[in-house]
């Protein structure tokens, strides 16, 4: 079970010392969006992820892939592949902020996620002042949808 909240972050509110935090390079593509079926490369590891419907709480299954399997599925992804750097920032109460900084063509999009052990913990979470809009329960809560909205704004 995945229980998380998501927040948009503005560039001017990003922590100044991002590279001092542990981070990973990610590339991902969506094979399906309803339900979410995603392939992801995280550094030198590869995964197939299934996510059930839901906003703050949903089922999530991560299955390891070989590099060959990932490369085979890559061309089947819907739309372009998404590249980003994920920074792991320690947060109060033993939590971790996963801050995604997207590469082109979505450069300028920053999304923070915080995972919780219970819905009660998630609902009582008071985010840091540098967080922006809470998009957990909006139609924008899925990264894929965020990217489509960001793409539309840049096309105007």
Please tell me what each predicted stretch does.
Residues 8-14, 18-27, 31-111, 116-141:
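Charged surface patches that recognize polyanionic ligands
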Residues 145-152:
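Conserved small/polar residues in nucleotide/adenosyl-binding loops
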